[in-house]
């Protein structure tokens, strides 16, 4: 089974504001744990975070096809898998993340996954595996596993009862995730969660300052992170 072994925490080992929710940062394909850690100072600078490195290695730290840096990693065996392969990859990665949370985060600490692309799918899939553990979820340019492999999304039958707040944002010019898949993800979330969905004109497979602004407002409205003046 997959296992999360590398984590970057916010200051103080992710324990400076223990009464506020801990953000669980999940990067996209070909990135690493530093990616979303940098983003958090714009989104929720007064909350703690734990940014997890995906366990599948595309390139170790140094120079290579992904440039020079801290390395490139993936949660799945392909950039954008589909069908049964995506179900299996999503379940394996979500289980690895959920296991890490169980081992490393006190049970009474609220946890909010925030992910981009592959990580955005997993921020949703954690709700399809163990929804009771997660206070809310944020999917940025994420997509959805189809749920055709039996047991790969075991909580689908009851997650809607929990009415978990979810923020879902994507660019209207996304060329990585097909637009019908983004629409289908939003539709599934609307049916199964307490959804706020936003789309951004002129934005590709990326995040934007407008999205950060909307996300900050949403976090404040749901009392997840204090508003920023």
Task: Outline where the language-model segments fall.
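Serine-hydrolase catalytic machinery in alpha/beta-hydrolase-like enzymes
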Residues: 2-107
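C-terminal catalytic histidine-bearing segment of alpha/beta-hydrolase fold enzymes
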Residues: 180-229
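Gly/Ala-rich beta-loop-alpha elbow adjacent to hydrolase catalytic centers
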Residues: 115-119, 123
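Alpha/beta-hydrolase fold nucleophile elbow
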Residues: 106-115
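Short beta-strand/loop motif that positions the catalytic acidic residue
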Residues: 162, 168-170, 174
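A conserved short beta-strand
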Residues: 132-144
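Acidic catalytic loop of the alpha/beta-hydrolase fold
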Residues: 146, 172-177, 205-206
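Conserved alpha/beta-hydrolase "nucleophile elbow" surrounding the catalytic nucleophile
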Residues: 27-29, 114-116, 171
């Amino acid at each position: 089974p997959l296992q999360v072994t590398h984590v970057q925490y916010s200051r103080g080992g992710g324990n400076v504001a223990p009464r506020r929710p801990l953000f669980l940062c999940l990067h996209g394909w070909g990135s690493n744990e530093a990616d979303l850690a940098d983003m958090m100072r714009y989104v929720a600078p007064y909350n703690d975070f734990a940014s997890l490195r995906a366990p599948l290695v595309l390139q170790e730290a140094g120079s290579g096809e992904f440039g020079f840096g801290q390395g490139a990693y993936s949660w799945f065996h392909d950039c954008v898998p589909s069908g049964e392969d995506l179900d299996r990859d999503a379940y394996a990665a979500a289980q690895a993340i959920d296991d890490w949370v169980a081992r490393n985060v006190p049970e009474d600490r609220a946890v909010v996954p925030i992910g981009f692309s592959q990580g955005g799918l997993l921020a949703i899939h954690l709700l399809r595996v163990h929804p009771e553990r997660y206070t809310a979820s944020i999917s940025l340019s994420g997509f959805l596993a189809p749920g055709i492999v039996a047991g790969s999304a075991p909580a689908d039958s009851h997650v809607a009862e929990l009415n978990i707040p979810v923020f879902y944002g994507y660019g209207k010019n996304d060329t990585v995730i097909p637009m019908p898949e983004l629409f289908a993800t939003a539709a599934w979330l609307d049916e199964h969660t307490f959804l706020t969905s936003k789309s951004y004109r002129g934005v590709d497979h990326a995040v934007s300052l407008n999205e950060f602004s909307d996300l900050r407002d949403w976090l404040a409205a749901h009392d997840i992170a204090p508003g920023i003046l």
